[in-house]
Amino acid sequence: MSWDDAIDGVDRDTPGGRMPRAWNVAARLRAANDDISHAHVADGLPAYAELHCLSDFSFLRGASSAEQLFVRAQHCGYSALAITDECSLAGIVRGLEASRATGVRLIVGSEFALVDGTRFVLLVENAHGYPQLCGLITTARRAASKGAYRLGRAEVQAQFRDVAPGVFALWLPGAQPQAEQGAWLQQVFGERAFLAVELHREQDDVARLQVLQALAQQLGMTALASGDVHMAQRRERIVQDTLTAIRHTLPLAECGAHLFRNGERHLRTRRALGNIYPDGLLQATVELAQRCTFDISKLQYTYPRELVPQGHTPASYLRQLTEAGMRERWPDGVPKKIRDDIENELALIAELEYEAFFLTVQDVVRFARSKDILCQGRGSSANSAVCYALSITSVDPSKTRLLISRFLSKARNEPPDIDVDFEHERREEVLQYVYAKYGRERAALAATVICYRGKSAVRDVAKAFGLPPDQIALLANCYGWGNGETPMEQRIEEAGFDLANPLINKILLVTDHLRDHPRHLSQHVGGFVISDEPLSLLVPVENAAMADRTIIQWDKDDLETMKLLKVDCLALGMLTCIRKTLDLVRGHRHRDYTLATLPDEDAATYKMIQRADTVGVFQIESRAQMAMLPRLKPAEFYDLVIEVAIVRPGPIQGDMVHPYLQRRKDKSLINYPSEGVEQILGPTLGIPLFQEQVMELVIHAGYDPDEADKLRRSMAAWRRGGDMESHRLRIRALMEGKGYASSFIDQIFEQIKGFGSYGFPQSHAASFAKLVYASCWLKRHEPAAFACGLLNAQPMGFYSASQIVQDARRGSPERERVEVLPVDVLHSDWDNTLVGGRPWRSAADPGEQPAIRLGMRQVAGLSQVVAQRIVAARTQRAFADIGDLCLRAALDEKARLALAEAGALHGLVGNRNAARWVMAGVEARRPLLPGSPEERPVAFEAPRAGEEILADYRSVGLSLRQHPMALLRPQMRQRRILGLRELQGRRHGSGVHVAGLVTQRQRPATAKGTIFVTLEDEQGMINVIVWSHLALRRRRALLESRLLAVRGRWERVDGVEHLIAGDLYDLSNLLGDMQLPSRDFH
């Protein structure tokens, strides 16, 4: 079924597809404009400007994007289009981009509904009116919870009291117009108040027109036409109706009066409007539009300047801090090249007037370090020698090739992007410092637009169409599973749905339309916008879901378009882990390391990395990275930089991985067409693995640095419709002019196109590689402290607490085993801790490791407050018995049962069964009279081994007893299923039969439907590769198994071992009720 079949009365004169947002809006709209280039605005039709139009940023009301609305307005020949989302300017920047692309003038406005029912639209006339509108929206949004607003007449009057309004007000009368509402608007806005006549081909249109014209005459207001537009075209009515049902949480069949009577709330042709409205009402829209002269692209923004001490300018103070940092970073003297780079950067920063921005980031980092919060800059800012001197970044520019245009470009005329990672458990301290320093009036987080994806869209749509919950779940699973090689229709039919069913067809059509449709605003992960003046003069501010947080209504792309600077204060779990590990080493081993003082280029650490012994470390812990490590064999820091970057969609799609690995093995394959190219590509053996190398290559060929940056942006946009063809022709011409072979040029350009997929810049990879090395060094030399720190930093990373503990206890040829002790109220703190020294030794390192005592944070259902009470009471004196524990730690029933289930009372009462009994009746067992005999203790038999393991996983998420697979090993033998250690002796290519607990499932976007599954038994872990055809055939077993059996082919190549699955089946029934942690598609 097509859209035309789905709904009657469809406009067929313009394209209706949704266009995804990218930086080059003009390129995205060009195809649509070409399609409608035949449309001709006929002479004699009335001119018109639409002054009341909702985009899809009136969440769950507007059905069309700003791009779609402006394309339609251009087609219809409108002179202007106002985007008037409800109490919001969240979509206005997209309106600006679409206006630029189509030539239809944008008017900035917003719709409001007061608590007393009065409805009106405000349109910005001039630069004075814009901050007035922003302030009113901010007032309304800050007075309500996230996503809502509350506005009364008093707040409106207060906003415009004692100031000349710079806005126009359009009164939107209700079904029964109340003259008093219009009179009140006149009182506030005077002659700037207009009466909007909105007619939608309903039975009472003639009478309504007469009533409203008479009312306008009575009040002395100018009346004008208005559309109350909710969609670009009539065909989108089915979408708008569905959004209405979702908004009211009702099935469509029960929405009744909530739905519009027809599809007239679209951008109608001027001919249609001329048949509905008197000419005077249409002409009034054009006249008012002409009075709205405000251009939002001219918005002025000033960065805070209070960090500059008296007697300094921003430039002089930034230079002073940079020079002080240079002396600290290079105590033996600054290399001449670095000094020259810094001078060039400072000159460029001064020219672009970004000094205050750099000072702000430096101040935030200074605060974090003063509080011992680990932090590190990353991304393109690692190309900046100034950022390194200011201690924002940690990659020494004297040891890397800097490309400042990747970070800061005069031609780009856009703010630089500085991302700083902080410990994830302490980042809130940093955010609150920013709020405290600048005030909530001048600092807020950027927004993130949460959009529908296939699965979330089909759930809401199917519910709106009245599908039963079980069928909704089945249909949603079709969107949550699959690959590009399997058509959606096939997946849906396999799930049991009939595509010929009109209901199912409509659900799928609407779902497809709602993909990427905005659902609501959320807060950015850490992008702060800070201004010298109140932010609400620039953009509305509203409450975030979290307490003590506010967000602006624009996202990072909007900020880039509007050239507003943001400081990214991001959270990184590995920094928390490293800081906690260093604290443990300092406290228990009396070794005072910092990130900067960990021994460099440690051979033992690289040996461990080459064996892919990297569970829990940063970045190189995934199965794909582990498979790469034995092949790449990192032996120095730059190898880690490459390792971080190479297992990414960009290098994979650009066919860079295998050529690079082949050249590492066989240096005779390396060749360069010139010495200049060798200088650029030499570190990566002739393969451009990084964006900076691509930029350097084209600069070497003849681009200037700013042109090279435009190429980088084109690479990022290429897969979203960006234009690479012009670059291809020019690059070919320039490289041919240098005498490069055609095959080399073709190869380079194909690799350049690969960067259209996600890839790391070298600066970013180098920043991350610092943390890769640090985490690996700590895992190798301080395995107990690292595992303990990792557990205390959870949740984070790829691996569950169970896998982390299993890995620590198992050890490896390169690192010591670690003993792990159970949770015990007599010994455990809230956090996991290090205790004593253990005699485990390995041939690689005869040093002694402490044991890990599991903390009460591992106990499900136990709060930190309760754990702290237990520790405080225990510190005063040891617990005599269970009653003493419960009394002095004030344990409620929930805490008592949680501790009993976790086996944490072993030291007081013995086994789990006894603990459950005692804790269940602890309040009931009290003497009736003084001197009454005590109840005799009941002897309880300890639970069986399997029951203990089951209880461990249920209450602690891990078990220190036998591995569940050890208990099942006799049954595995009967089924001729091998233990994972037995695979080590198998030949490459031999058939094997194994089974293990599923601990991970991954489906990389570049793997064409292939699923990677990690299995674990008592002997270790293996990676299983499940090709897409088998994944589809054994979908249920693959996705739902806790214990998965695999028949397949064992492969061992270049030190990489994995199992290619030939068949799968589920053995979860052998585990009973045991629920095991698995990190799926993480």
UniProtKB/Swiss-Prot annotation:
Membership in a protein family: Belongs to the DNA polymerase type-C family. DnaE2 subfamily.
GO molecular function, one term: DNA-directed DNA polymerase activity
Functional note: DNA polymerase involved in damage-induced mutagenesis and translesion synthesis (TLS). It is not the major replicative DNA polymerase.
Entry superkingdom: Bacteria
CDD domains, per the entry: DnaE_OBF, PHP_PolIIIA_DnaE2
Keyword entries, A-Z: Cytoplasm, DNA damage, DNA repair, DNA replication, DNA-directed DNA polymerase, Nucleotidyltransferase, Transferase
Gene giving rise to this polypeptide: dnaE2
Main localisation: cytoplasm
EC number, as in UniProt: 2.7.7.7
Keyword DNA repair: yes
Protein name: Error-prone DNA polymerase
Alphabetical list of SUPFAM superfamilies matching this protein: PHP domain-like (SSF89550)
Cellular localization per UniProt: Cytoplasm
GO cellular component term, pick one: cytoplasm
Class in the EC hierarchy, top level: transferase
Keyword Metal-binding: no
Gene Ontology BP terms: DNA repair; DNA replication
Catalytic reactions of this protein: DNA(n) + a 2'-deoxyribonucleoside 5'-triphosphate = DNA(n+1) + diphosphate
InterPro entries per the UniProt record, alphabetical: DNA_pol3_alpha_NTPase_dom (IPR011708), DNA_pol3_finger (IPR040982), DnaE2 (IPR023073), DnaE2/DnaE/PolC (IPR004805), DNAPol_HHH (IPR029460), NA-bd_OB_tRNA (IPR004365), PHP_dom (IPR004013), Pol/His_phosphatase_N (IPR003141)
